[in-house]
Structure formats: C-alpha cells, structure tokens
C-alpha cells in the first residue's frame, strides 16, 4: 500500500504525518531521538488523501488551544499489548493526566514499566495522547521526543498551570 507523507509546522517544530489512503499510520516530531529522523523536514507530498487534511485540521485545533473533536482514523502498528495500552490512552481527556500505574491497572498489567515501554513505542504521537501519561507523584516523566516537548504539550492543554 502506498504511503503518503506531509509535514505540519507546529509551534513546537515540524511534525511528520504518514498515512495510507485511509488512515494515519505515524505522526512524529522531527526532533525525535531515533536515528531514522530526517535532517530536515520533508516537503509535503502531493496529492495527499483526505485523511491528511483531517489530521492537519486536528493539529490546527489542538495548537489553537481547542479540544479537537474529530479524531482522524488511525492505524497504529504494534503488538496486542501495545495496542491495548494505546487504546487506554484515549480515556485521558484533553487537559487531564494519568500515571503509568493507573494505565497499568486499566489494562490489567502489574508492571508500570511495561506500560511505559508501550507508551514510548506509540507511533502516532499527540493524537494517541502519550504525552498525558506522567510518572508517580506528579513528575512529568519521559517522552520519546524529549521532556521539553512534553512539557510544552501539557502547557498547551493548561495542565501544568493547574498543578501545584
């Protein structure tokens, strides 16, 4: 199946969106720590399927400080356990957080570390809200794209301003 790629310029830097003709398969910040990150943001592929435009609208709403309503169709690839964890992340509403331990209990797993690994493997950052998962005792915890990006995403949702 053909892969489509587009780049979104966010207040936090470029975001690369990848899809097939029906669903988003990957969404990542260009500052990703992994070695497979392009040195510069790729140019938007033309033509792109409607799912790309839907995702760009979702991102526009998000970075405008609005709670995005319509989640684009997603097709993340992962293990059954990872997919269970990623599905649980959708229960964390915009402007809220949960701990790795809370997510572990939700998916019936005894290990918050295993949940942390699944959260870290999320291929569709931001839309699958892994940035809303924090460490115990309110610590911000890690993030595949760095804690500064995670902190800024939480600020977009006014989460950090409400915490003591």
For the regions a language model picked out, list residue spans one by one.
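Short, basic, alpha-helical segments at the C-terminal edge of helix-turn-helix-like DNA-binding modules
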Residues: 132-136
């Amino acid at each position: 199946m053909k892969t489509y790629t587009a780049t979104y310029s966010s207040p936090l830097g470029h975001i690369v969106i990848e899809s097939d003709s029906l669903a988003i398969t990957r969404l990542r910040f260009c500052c990703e720590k992994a070695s497979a990150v392009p040195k510069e943001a790729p140019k938007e592929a033309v033509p792109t399927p409607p799912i790309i435009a839907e995702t760009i609208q979702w991102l526009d709403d998000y970075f405008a400080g609005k709670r995005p309503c319509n989640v684009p169709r997603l097709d993340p690839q992962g293990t059954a356990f990872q997919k269970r964890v990623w599905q649980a992340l959708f229960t964390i509403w915009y402007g809220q957080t949960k701990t790795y331990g809370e997510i572990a209990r939700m998916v019936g797993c005894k290990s918050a570390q295993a949940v942390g690994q699944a959260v870290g493997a999320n291929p569709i950052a931001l839309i699958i809200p892994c940035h809303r998962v924090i460490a115990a005792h309110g610590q911000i915890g890690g993030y595949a794209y760095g804690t500064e990006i995670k902190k800024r995403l939480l600020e977009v949702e006014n989460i950090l301003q409400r915490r003591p």
